[in-house]
Amino acid sequence: MNHKKDLYVLGIETSCDETAAAIVKNGTDIISNVVASQIESHKRFGGVVPEIASRHHVEQITIVLEEAFAQADMTFDDIDAIAVTEGPGLVGALLIGVNAAKALSFARGIPLVGVHHIAGHIYANRLVQDIQFPAIALVVSGGHTELVYMKEHGSFEVIGETLDDAAGEAYDKVARTMGLPYPGGPHIDKLAQKGEANVPLPRAWLEEGSYHFSFSGLKSAVINTLHNASQKGETIAPEDLSASFQESVIDVLVTKTERAAEAYGVKQVLLAGGVAANKGLRAALEKTFSSRPEIELLIPPLSLCTDNAAMIAAAGTVAFEKGIRGKYDMNGQPGLDLTSY
């Protein structure tokens, strides 16, 4: 009888402002997962400063790697492959992780696999439950808002994407206008839970049948609403404005996801990306798909929504099993395309 050997993959993630390392077994089981966040260092600047991010990655990369192995009680002799975020992201930040992965791969003779950051977010779902195909992933983060159709493992077709601001980017810009701290998304989400969506704001549906998104008009509408109220000496409750803004964003995201899921006849809808931690979005998706028993909704736990290396190891496992290998001329690719990955 054939017994398949367990596959242990070391994941490394440094695409933005988290330095992370993890070890995952067979693409589904987290053995260790270590994340060093830099949020406090970037808060006073109101956003991620690339130079600061890169410096922190240099300081933290060895520490998180050592901790990942310590938590797993494993050594490099136990590792079958090293998966690293190749892109997209901040080029200086990416280079820290990529160079660390290449050095370890070369020194230890362990195969190297480059991973697309968004593929990682999608495969965070596989760390919770196996993915059934065909599936559609709603990817919502600070830099990306996409609907991705998957007919099998490692197959990605972007059927809808933002034409301007990503949803997470719109959240941060609106939060800054409202005087809320960075990162703005969680603050708006928290305020929205206490408010009423009574401020009229637009929803960008675009042309009929389109799965694309646009949030720049909504962002401008919020800014204009605040400016007009100020000119008249009026105040708008931040809870109500947050609830109204969030409802406009979520309405479009959920409606287009449901339409796409129906049109493509999928078995599962996967939520992915940092904004997947948003309580309002999670609740709206759960409510919508609770009445669609033929479509299963997968939502990762909060710890796997934001950037982490376990998701990179999970996606890297799929690539490794398909025979994909990275070369030592691998570089950080800030504009890496998901469909060509």
UniProtKB/Swiss-Prot annotation:
Its cofactor is Fe(2+). It is an enzyme of class 2 (transferase). It catalyses: L-threonylcarbamoyladenylate + adenosine(37) in tRNA = N(6)-L-threonylcarbamoyladenosine(37) in tRNA + AMP + H(+). It is found in: Cytoplasm. Its main location: cytoplasm. One of its GO terms (cellular component) is cytoplasm. Fe cation binds at H117, H121, D307. InterPro entries: ATPase_NBD, Gcp-like_dom, KAE1/TsaD, TsaD. Substrate binds at V139, V140, S141, G142, G143, D172, G185, D189, N278. One of its GO terms (molecular function) is iron ion binding. It holds the Pfam family TsaD. Disulfide bonds: none annotated. It comes from the Bacteria. Its EC number is 2.3.1.234. Keywords: Acyltransferase, Cytoplasm, Iron, Metal-binding, Transferase, tRNA processing. GO terms for biological process: tRNA threonylcarbamoyladenosine modification. Binds 1 Fe(2+) ion per subunit. PANTHER family: TRNA N6-ADENOSINE THREONYLCARBAMOYLTRANSFERASE, TRNA N6-ADENOSINE THREONYLCARBAMOYLTRANSFERASE, MITOCHONDRIAL. NCBIfam families: gcp_kae1, T6A_TsaD_YgjD. Belongs to the KAE1 / TsaD family. Required for the formation of a threonylcarbamoyl group on adenosine at position 37 (t(6)A37) in tRNAs that read codons beginning with adenine. Is involved in the transfer of the threonylcarbamoyl moiety of threonylcarbamoyl-AMP (TC-AMP) to the N6 group of A37, together with TsaE and TsaB. TsaD likely plays a direct catalytic role in this reaction. This is tRNA N6-adenosine threonylcarbamoyltransferase. It comes from Bacillus licheniformis (strain ATCC 14580 / DSM 13 / JCM 2505 / CCUG 7422 / NBRC 12200 / NCIMB 9375 / NCTC 10341 / NRRL NRS-1264 / Gibson 46).
